[in-house]
């Protein structure tokens, strides 16, 4: 074939750029360069572009070809070029006669998908080249020796090099700094552009996009995530792609997602109406959140529907029917007792004629008749095989109340308790052992005990006086910042009185709940650059490591810490949820590799592979990491002299620990310390440390009322069908669980107890919308496993309802931390 080639070069090949190369290394980006070959005789090499998946070369080479010549362009990683696979990143093969007529002449722009080699290594991305028969203009690669040096220097900083635009082309579109993440493939869309009308001169488009000649192929600009080829998206909308390359849209105004692009007539009024509707849904869900101490078994939802098999007739032959018992259990009402007073009790009357009762055993008095009967739920196996039993007993049977407590009755004869130590009331009897019985799961005993202990501490007692906070609804973030930061920590511990400007409401709890609901929506909004959505999904938050773009960011983090502490202190909930590692950091626990899954799924997978495999001769790493900040890439040593310390099988565990700590903790250490300084002004560190990270999430955000029907409706199955016995048993079990157990299951399978505002249909994974999935996987003797990044539960085919409930309960309730797969 070489004998048929012309004596002089007749084709100019411009290797413009590659886009979306495969990241083959675990912790660093490749240093790509391209090699162009014709017939194995003519070989040309581009310069090396440092640390990028989107290299931009724009280098020209003149070749001797005929129509049967095969142009092969391979891409390699320069750092691994001496390895066995030479750092291969992909190849394209182009038969010249298929794309350009050498006799007629022409100019063709090609975009080709990179292909695998014989080694079958995974490759990804596209290569953009230009073929031209016009060699009359000088080759700048030969004429200007500075070209490669300048190109390499500019690109190594993470910026796409720009070519000065011709005056006839307006400088428009986003800057190259905004687009530093990629030389967007959106601008390289045509795979072949007809050459008939293509002139030989090329005009560099704005934003440093690869040069595309004037003519029929009109280039699309590099598009930001807030626009697409139809134009700018409405305010608050963002365009994203899932792992399959499908485009979906995120509405940050309502925190929802959709496959459909918001229409052009999506005006401000439509946006406002939809936002208000979603706000009402979120507000209602937020106000229904509670904690175990806020309800006894008497107020468990749908008790009459979910636990009929666990009910037993009340002791003592009271004649009350089962339905009446369930009704009284659900309302917490009591019935008048008869017969003699218990031993040591005496009935007396005040001067006004009101009866009261004296307990000479404990030298206490009460308004409540000790003979009055109440119905309580006792945990543990009963005769019918159920887990709970409803029993009737006198209110005095449990013995004296703790010091500072008082028992009272509502006008519906329901008993409630006043804690004069903390000036609070509760339906929950502090003496009641029902939810502390041996049959109760350990997590439930622990959490409730911890809450009772936590609330009873002197540091958590509301001080005398009032703390007035006045805010405007439309400026709640800045007003709250000014009000809360001007007051001392001791003032914030007084009774919180919220006042909305222009509104007459008095704060008996409702206004403060509304205040924390609105404020948590505003201060955790990613548009303020203080927090960002995690890689895990679109509704769990993590600290933005680049929050320093706001010079006052540390003051704001201290303010946010105060707000979180204030909500816990005054027993309110925030409508916000963080990654699991954030709660561990609040408890001063050491983060682990498992916590990385919610922060960076790819890095978690790569680090896990590193620990489980022999890396000698495979991974060429040192104790450093690359960090990019506003387009500038820096190399950071994980330990002193880390750049000169190679990672080996012997020290890889230390390396993984250091990478994990840097990625989760060190990058945001300054911001987190400011947050904790504000938080600990109201909540002492030694008190909050009684909780684990899952319990802390529930303490801050509360427990949601979960719609099991909606959950089931938006669930996919792999290896199972909805009619299978295991699946039927699974949903039966979930329906019998109370709200706290359902929240624990949601935490276990998705990584958070938060439900999207529009229900489970909007559930997010690490790669976009991802429905809850139950997969048939595992041995029936093993426990279920979860994959929180994919909202997936691996459920073995258990043979019976009882085995499934036992295994699922252990996996969900007894597992501490985020150690699931």
From Swiss-Prot:
Highest rank taxon of the organism: Eukaryota
Domain WW per the UniProt entry, residue ranges: 231-264, 339-372, 399-432
Biased composition (Basic and acidic residues): 281-296
Reaction catalysed by this enzyme: S-ubiquitinyl-[E2 ubiquitin-conjugating enzyme]-L-cysteine + [acceptor protein]-L-lysine = [E2 ubiquitin-conjugating enzyme]-L-cysteine + N(6)-ubiquitinyl-[acceptor protein]-L-lysine
A GO term, aspect molecular function: ubiquitin-ubiquitin ligase activity
Keyword Transferase: yes
Chain's gene name: hulA
Segments forming domain C2: 1-112
Record's keyword annotation contains rRNA processing: no
Cellular location(s): Cytoplasm
Annotated pathway: Protein modification; protein ubiquitination
Similarity comment: family membership: Belongs to the RSP5/NEDD4 family.
GO CC annotation: cellular bud tip; cytoplasm; cytosolic ribosome; endosome membrane; Golgi apparatus; nucleus; RSP5-BUL ubiquitin ligase complex; ubiquitin ligase complex
Protein name: E3 ubiquitin-protein ligase RSP5
Subunit structure, as described in the record: Interacts with apyA and creD.
Active site residues according to the UniProt entry: 789
Biased composition, class Polar residues, residue ranges: 133-144, 188-201, 255-272, 297-312
First and last residue of the signal peptide: none
EC number(s) reported in the record: 2.3.2.26
Comp. bias intervals (Low complexity): 202-217, 320-339
């Amino acid at each position: 074939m070489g004998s048929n080639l012309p004596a002089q070069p007749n084709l100019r090949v411009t290797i413009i750029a590659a886009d979306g190369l495969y990241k083959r290394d675990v912790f660093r980006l490749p240093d790509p360069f391209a090699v162009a070959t014709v017939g194995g005789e003519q070989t040309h090499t581009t310069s090396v572009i440092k640390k990028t998946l989107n290299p931009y070369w724009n280098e020209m080479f003149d070749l001797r070809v005929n129509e049967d010549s095969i142009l092969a362009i391979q891409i390699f990683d320069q750092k691994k070029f001496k390895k066995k696979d030479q750092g291969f990143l992909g190849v394209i093969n182009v038969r010249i006669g298929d794309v350009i007529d050498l006799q007629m002449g022409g100019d063709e722009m090609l975009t080709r998908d990179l292909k695998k080699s014989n080694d079958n290594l995974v490759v990804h991305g596209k290569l953009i080249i230009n073929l031209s028969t016009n060699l009359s203009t000088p080759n700048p690669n030969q004429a200007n020796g500075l070209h490669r040096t300048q190109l390499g220097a500019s690109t190594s900083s993470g910026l796409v090099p720009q070519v000065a635009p011709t005056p006839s082309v307006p400088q428009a579109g986003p800057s190259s700094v905004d687009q530093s993440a990629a030389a967007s493939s959106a601008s390289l869309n045509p795979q072949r552009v007809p050459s008939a009308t293509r002139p030989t001169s090329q005009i560099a488009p704005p934003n440093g996009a690869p040069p595309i000649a004037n003519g029929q192929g009109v280039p699309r600009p590099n598009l930001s995530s807030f626009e697409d080829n139809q134009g700018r998206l409405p305010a608050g909308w963002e365009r994203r792609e899932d792992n399959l390359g499908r485009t979906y849209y995120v509405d940050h105004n309502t925190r929802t997602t959709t496959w459909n692009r918001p229409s052009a007539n999506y005006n401000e009024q439509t946006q406002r109406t939809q936002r208000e509707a979603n706000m009402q849904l979120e507000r209602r869900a937020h106000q229904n959140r509670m904690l175990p101490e806020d309800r006894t078994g008497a107020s468990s939802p749908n008790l009459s529907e979910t636990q009929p098999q666990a009910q037993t007739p009340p002791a003592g032959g009271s004649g009350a029917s089962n339905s009446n018992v369930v009704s009284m259990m659900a309302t917490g009402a009591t019935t008048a007792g008869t017969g003699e007073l218990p031993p040591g009790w005496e009935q007396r009357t005040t001067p006004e004629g009101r009866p009261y009762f004296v307990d000479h055993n404990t030298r206490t008095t009460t308004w409540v008749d000790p003979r009055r009967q109440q119905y309580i739920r006792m945990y543990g196996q009963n005769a019918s095989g159920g887990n709970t039993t409803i029993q009737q007993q006198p209110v005095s049977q449990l013995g004296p109340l703790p010091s500072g407590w008082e028992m009272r009755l509502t006008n519906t004869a329901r008993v409630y308790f006043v804690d004069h130590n903390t000036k609070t009331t509760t339906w929950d009897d502090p003496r009641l052992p029902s939810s502390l019985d041996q049959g109760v799961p350990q997590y439930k005993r622990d959490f409730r005990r911890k809450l009772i202990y936590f609330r009873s501490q002197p540091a958590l007692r509301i001080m005398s006086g009032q703390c007035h906070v006045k805010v405007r609804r439309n400026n709640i973030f800045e007003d709250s910042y000014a009000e809360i930061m001007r007051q001392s920590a001791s003032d914030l511990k007084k009774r919180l009185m919220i006042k909305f400007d222009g509104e007459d409401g008095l704060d008996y709890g409702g206004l403060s709940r509304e205040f924390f609901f609105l404020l948590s929506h505003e201060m955790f909004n990613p548009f303020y650059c203080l927090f960002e959505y995690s890689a895990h999904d679109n509704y769990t938050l993590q600290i933005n490591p680049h929050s320093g773009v706001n010079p006052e960011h540390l003051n704001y983090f201290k303010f946010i810490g105060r707000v979180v502490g204030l909500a816990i202190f005054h027993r309110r909930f925030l409508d916000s949820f963080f990654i699991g590692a954030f709660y561990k950091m609040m408890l001063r626990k050491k983060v682990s590799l498992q916590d990385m899954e919610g922060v960076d799924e790819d890095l978690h997978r790569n680090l896990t592979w590193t620990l489980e495999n022999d890396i000698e001769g495979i991974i060429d790493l040192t104790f450093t990491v690359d960090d990019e900040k506003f387009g500038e890439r820096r190399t950071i040593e994980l330990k002193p002299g880390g750049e000169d310390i190679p990672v080996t099988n012997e020290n890889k565990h230390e390396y993984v620990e250091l990478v994990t700590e840097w990625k989760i903790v060190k990058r945001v250490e300054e911001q987190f310390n400011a947050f904790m300084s504000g938080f600990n002004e109201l909540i002492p560190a030694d008190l909050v440390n009684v909780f684990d990270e899952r319990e802390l999430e529930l303490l801050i955000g509360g427990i949601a009322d979960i719609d099991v029907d909606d959950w089931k409706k938006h669930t996919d199955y792999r290896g199972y069908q909805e009619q299978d016995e295991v699946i039927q048993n699974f949903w039966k079990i979930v329906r019998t669980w109370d709200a706290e157990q359902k929240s624990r299951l949601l935490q276990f399978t998705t990584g958070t107890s938060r439900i999207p505002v529009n229900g489970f249909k909007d559930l997010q994974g690490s790669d976009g919308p991802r429905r809850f999935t139950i997969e048939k996987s595992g041995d029936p003797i093993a426990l279920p496993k979860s994959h929180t990044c994919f909202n997936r539960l691996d459920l073995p085919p258990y043979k019976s309802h009882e085995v499934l409930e036992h295994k699922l309960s252990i996996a969900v309730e007894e597992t501490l931390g985020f150690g699931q797969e």
